[in-house]
Amino acid sequence: MKKKNSGKKLNVLLTIKKIGINGEGIGYYKKKITFVKGALPDEVIVCEIIEETPKYIIGKLVKVKESSPYRVEVKKEYAESGAYGLAHVSYEKQLEYKRNILLDAFDKYYKLPKPDKLVLKTLASPMIEHYRNKNQFPLAVRNGRVIAGLYKEGSNDLVEINEDVALHENGNKITNLAKKCLGKYKVEISTNKKTYGVKYISTRTSFYNGDVQLTFVANTDKIKNLDKVVNEIKREAIVKSIVLNVTNDNDHLVMGSENITLYGSDYIVEKIGDTKYELSAKSFFQLNPGATKKLYDKVVEFADLRETNIVLDAFCGVGTIGQYVSRKCHEVYGVDIVEDAIKDANNNVKLNNLTNCIYVAGDANKIVPRWKKKGINFDVAIVDPPRTGLGHLAKNLLDVDAKKIVYVSCNPSTLARDLKVLTRKYKIRRIQPIDMFPGTAAVEAVVELIKK
């Protein structure tokens, strides 16, 4: 049973031993594992115990008595929001910690043979600031001003952010202009389910040409004076698309199913390597285009495709990876549960003049066996699942019997669990961590598996 520390404050001295999977410092108080956000390995700290369970303690950093040489200053708003869990660490050390986070996940969920040899050094992001192509900021009204930012960790208090150091400069520019215009024309802002208005601002910027798509997320399609906001913002040459997304407040997702284009195109175009992608307001796309090219190049290297190869692209999304590798193989079969993603994938096939990519909307667990029954024999299976991992598809991949699997992961824990299943039939050749999100504890990985 969890219990909050409701009595007198209990401050304890702690030596931090390592970094946890979410970027928190880990120490031990009375032999019980203690998690302290903002603390670094080898630091001696004072922390307040704020929660204790039979298995672990959560502490709040009060003071650093002996500081790590790798600690750096971090902007207050990022420390408060909790979104950038390693922003207080030098970048070279972040890369080391991220590899360790991956190793710790394997240690917990699946014991790798010779992990130090299999897990390579983390590939750095080409940019460590202004690397993100997209933001999605909730709105509020404070002292008569419309503000946007990130919620303070564990609360509904909005931390105002006027310049997101991770976001493309064009995204910052248009976000600030949108806030100003919403306030200027007194557009209704909704901060709860009882009011109607604009709830979020989202921008997506193409690193290929600098174009910006601005999306207002609202819980109604009838918003007074939004047309005046659009008329002012569209004067900016970099704005190529303005969209209203209508969301259902009862849904846990930020964006709803309905997009209304208020100005310009339904899409902006991004380019990774020689491949272009049309992206709508709802399209899922990697957030760091520079590091994405590194990731996709690593997929190409690990897949080692031949012109005669047939490739399975599971969880294909808008076709990003499959189309990137398509020029090196005979055919690509892509499947994704999201119908809108498959529509975008087929649009991207036309955009890139490709003739060897086939996309189907549906559950991969049903579609892939159907392809197998039709006599389609996959030489290479590329999988890029969500954070929840492969699920039942892990076992179904064993029946696909591809010579090789290339697994792209955004969650070390589910990766380790899935590899425990896949290694019944496949051998792990190498694991490449890649930093897609500098300043955070997130780490992506590409795994090469070959049939035993």
Model-derived segments and their meaning:
Residues 25-30, 149-153, 215-217, 345:
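Short, acidic/hydrophobic/Gly-rich beta-strand patch recurrent on exposed beta strands
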Residues 120-127, 199-204, 432-436:
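Short, solvent-exposed loop/turn elements at beta->coil junctions and helix N-caps
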Residues 203, 209-219, 276-280:
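Short, aliphatic-rich beta-strand segments
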Residues 65-73, 80-188, 208:
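Extended interfacial segments that mediate partner engagement and assembly in macromolecular machines
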Residues 2-21, 221-452:
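Rossmann-like S-adenosyl-L-methionine
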Residues 158-199, 220-248:
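Internal alpha/beta scaffold segment
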Residues 1-79, 110-113, 366:
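Terminal RNA-binding accessory module
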